[in-house]
Amino acid sequence: MTLARFVLALVLGALPEVVGFDSVLNDSLHHRHRHSPPPGPQYPYYLPTHQRPPRTRPPPPLPRFSRPPRALLAQRPHALQAGHTPRRHPWGCPPGEPWVSVTDFGAPCLRWAEVPPFLERSPPASWAQLRGQRHNFCRSPDGPGRPWCFYGDARGKVDWGYCDCRHGSVRLRGGKNEFEGTVEVYASGVWGTVCSSHWDDSDASVICHQLQLGGKGIAKQTPFSGLGLIPIYWSNVRCRGDEENILLCEKDIWQXGVCPQKMAAAVTCSFSHGPAFPIIRLVGGNSVHEGRVELYHAGQWGTVCDDQWDDADAEVICRQLGLSGIAKAWHQAYFGEGSGPVMLDEVRCTGNELSIEQCPKSSWGEHNCGHKEDAGVSCTPLTDGVIRLAGGKGSHEGRLEVYYRGQWGTVCDDGWTELNTYVACRQLGFKYGKQASANHFEESTGPIWLDDVSCSGKETRFLQCSRRQWGRHDCSHREDVSIACYPGSEGHRLSLGFPVRLMDGENKKEGRVEVFINGQWGTICDDGWTDKDAAVICRQLGYKGPARARTMAYFGEGKGPIHVDNVKCTGNERSLADCIKQDIGRHNCRHSEDAGVICDYFGKKASGNSNKESLSSVCGLRLLHRRQKRIIGGKNSLRGGWPWQVSLRLKSSHGDGRLLCGATLLSSCWVLTAAHCFKRYGNSTRNYAVRVGDYHTLVPEEFEEEIGVQQIVIHREYRPDSSDYDIALVRLQGPEEQCARFSSHVLPACLPFWRERPQKTASNCYITGWGDTGRAYSRTLQQAAIPLLPKRFCEERYKGRFTGRMLCAGNLHEHKRVDSCQGDSGGPLMCERPGESWAVYGVTSWGYGCGVKDSPGVYTKVSAFVPWIKSVTKL
């Protein structure tokens, strides 16, 4: 080793282990030993001319071989067979398959498929897996040991050399913590840097993923070291962002010169799901897909206790790390004991959560464990030969399917035996099993992958059994193998579940069903949606009470893709995935058909009646008002959020029971609406009914009630050819104060004071109704915040039509048009009073169009009619 190289190694901390200083000097990072090729046609093999390196390149030196591949022992030069064995040194290869594609002296590896004559003459069967492979990564096909590869010298000869797996390793230096710093790359025995030219977040993300510091990287730049001793290896790195290793990215070898701004590439790593989720890593495993679970919290890494640790917890960990496939929990420090604090205990995930933070668990730092109980997981990727059971009531039974080339397919039952069933169930983590009738499960529509399978019973994997080639069969799907497995003590099965959430409900137990598939939340179409489907959704979410299905976008329309259609659950399945019979993304629906559920549904209904004394204490109360939704420019309301909203409907003899007007409940027996609602069909009580407690017009609900009309009172000054005095009262059928039953979803609104000026006393005003949303009439109750305007706006716009018995309201901004429309006539304009009670200040009356610029809505001013209302209703 030269003095300059020794100083450089000392600065970088890369000085080789000193077995003897003389041996270090004689055995430098680049070996110089050469041997002559043996005679004969078999070795060396000459490359075609177009594959040869240019002759101007000096022949690369061979390494000293500490232990060459067994298959090449007979083909090595005699001098090498009888020669000395040089000092052995670690080569930095982790378990698994490295991404290195150069020898430890810098010669680029040939693709394995580029030397077929040599491989065909090589007898070991273990080499067959490399025949035809287009990659050039170093491998050890003849057994455990140091990986190697073939390379071509300048004369076109094929030779081989060992690889140093540390080549391409990365580290971060100079940052404030382990998640940030200048990127350093290991190559040719020395750590070096990367020029920051074209360095972006995709490149940074690959670095973070390679270091297991999260999937999200932010590209940074740092000045080069002033010493100038650190080499620059690459520039213009061009990663896609999904590479496993920086070696797999396109890049330019540094040819000296000036790096732009003299800046080196640097990164800041973070977890891709955002700061709300704890950072997780897997430590001590044989690959990035397994290890002891460690969480980063309060500035340090710690472990998780394995109390109640199961595959559902592992499913969440794997999902949070972005690792799909088989999730399995490991106990009792299977991947070694940690050394930091024990962060969490008693983790009890359902398997649906996106982060361990969302699972029930102990408080941070609370536990009764030692590191002998450290929890671990393995997240085995989906690979050819993975099996599952589909179409059954759970993951323990169903049609046997095998994963091959990115697609699930079935197995033909020709020659099927109990031993085959035993091996399949054992691979799925069950102890026992039996063949089931194919008639119990729906036929598959995918490929038939396997036929004539024959197992001895000793196999640990299904693909170890003898069988035909993939896709070769003489069967139909009527011959698909179906089995039922019985649980064993170790559950190791493929989890087919995906996260489910409920959106836009009154509480977390109800809402529009959304599922997380292919990295995106989407909805379920309500074709065939029943209470049995709802039961499975609620069970998957951890609810044990009765479940009810809701259809026709009962909880509002979703915005993402429609993932699933024609769900067919029996009600006993473990998760929604067990009910899906149709390809993901295939449907014939719109978001107006989004499915919903209500979990722990008990249908409790209040039956209390109102009286004059209690009316003042319950009027204007909104018991459910924590969320807001469309009149023109509006949003879906919260179910039960406007309990005084009622609808005036035509009886079926005069139509289909359709909505005619909105209205406001003033007491158990009296309703306020607009006089013009009765212009077309007259004021005969036989023509009308009033519906209270409604939310979705097409879905019957537990608080919903339709009541007949006993009396219609139109203000005596109202004229059909005018819009003034547009107010009416409706008396419901029933005994005094016992017409509509009050509940959390059915309550009266308060009246304003006589001559009260709401522009001065009221704030936070809303209009509600089922009217025109700008696209169609809404099925769900809509709401929209609306400002009260000075009367001059309406006087200027409507001239003499606007009187002192009217209110002017609406948003005049071009991008915030809010207005009531057809179908909302007679509905309330509500404003919140001090003290959190709500009063009806306006009755939707008229206007020029819907949401038209500079044309605010006009509402009957209720405060001008309070004496008349009280004289009629006796309130």
Curated annotation (Swiss-Prot):
Q: Where in the cell is it found?
A: Secreted
- Which positions make up the signal peptide? 1-20
Domain annotation SRCR: ranges: 170-271, 280-381, 387-487, 500-601
The keyword Glycoprotein is annotated on this UniProt entry: yes
Record site: Reactive bond homolog: 630-631
Predominant place of localization:
secreted
As one GO molecular function, the record gives:
serine-type endopeptidase activity
Entry's EC annotation: 3.4.21.-
Residue ranges for the region (Disordered) are 29-68
Q: Which family does it belong to?
A: Belongs to the peptidase S1 family.
What name does UniProt use for this protein?
Neurotrypsin
| The organism of origin for this protein | Trachypithecus phayrei (Phayre's leaf monkey)
